[in-house]
């Protein structure tokens, strides 16, 4: 027998053994428990828009990926809940069902409605304990009927033992263990249900840190590992109308991304009582891609004079929605072509990503 014939026989025996193992696994655990990827070709990942054109592009797939866990963290009043509510509003526009787990007991339905959320169809829960909140999340995900679940916030997921104990009792690591146990169960069911699970998280200052970033997020390290997307949202500056502050310029860094290249960033305006300013993004992105010409303080779109100053340009687009829609379509078309360009929206790959602290 030749060497080539012997090698073919060995390969044939290995293939038979592999087929037998696969058949045994399917009998034990059901069809679909194991498969070859060529039987299920890769498809474009479904996503839900964040409500920000720039952030959708920075995420690389046009929004938050379905079937994944997402963390949004940042300082107080930086726009975390606003961003999460915009995601809910966009999911509802697609006909999806959404839930808001209000662990902080601070949901403002009037504000949510102004952001475009259909509060009448929004499922809201205000749990008493962290265990109750995570059980509710599990039941909702397992139903397979929910598209987006927002948990606001991780820091407010108080373990039952801490609530029932005295004020001065120490419960080191209790919340971290609770989250670690819950996320082990939730990861697979979130994927199967094709649901987006968004955790809003707060930051704390770690005492005794001399070098490096002293900021840490609450809830331990488990959330850091189980998330596919981590968004760091910060206020950059105030937006003023004369002497009145009417909003904040906001920057979001994609500090972790499992579905596209990470370390990109996006900037947009959050206007009080309005949310993310899409018109402001259209002006800025229009200038970036060359559709809008900026000469000094004057903005123009072809032969159309948008106005002097950014706020006047936004005002013109607000009064002329056809022009705004035309510009937005051109910008989104350019973004679709350049979405995988690592230079677009890129930031330095710094190592100042937050650590996790056990509370």
Swiss-Prot record:
GO-annotated biological processes: DNA recombination; DNA repair; SOS response
The keyword Transcription belongs to this UniProt entry's keyword annotation: no
Positions with a binding annotation for ATP: 74-81
Keyword field contains DNA-binding: yes
Subcellular location: Cytoplasm
InterPro entries: AAA+_ATPase, DNA_recomb/repair_RecA, DNA_recomb/repair_RecA_CS, P-loop_NTPase, RecA-like_C, RecA-like_N, RecA_ATP-bd, RecA_C_sf
Keyword terms, alphabetized: ATP-binding, Cytoplasm, DNA damage, DNA recombination, DNA repair, DNA-binding, Nucleotide-binding, SOS response
Top-rank lineage group of the source organism: Bacteria
Gene Ontology CC, one term: cytosol
GO molecular function, one term: single-stranded DNA binding
Family, per entry: Belongs to the RecA family.
Biological role stated in the UniProt entry: Can catalyze the hydrolysis of ATP in the presence of single-stranded DNA, the ATP-dependent uptake of single-stranded DNA by duplex DNA, and the ATP-dependent hybridization of homologous single-stranded DNAs. It interacts with LexA causing its activation and leading to its autocatalytic cleavage.
Name listed for the protein in its UniProt record: Protein RecA
Source species: Anaplasma marginale (strain St. Maries)
Encoding gene, per UniProt annotation: recA
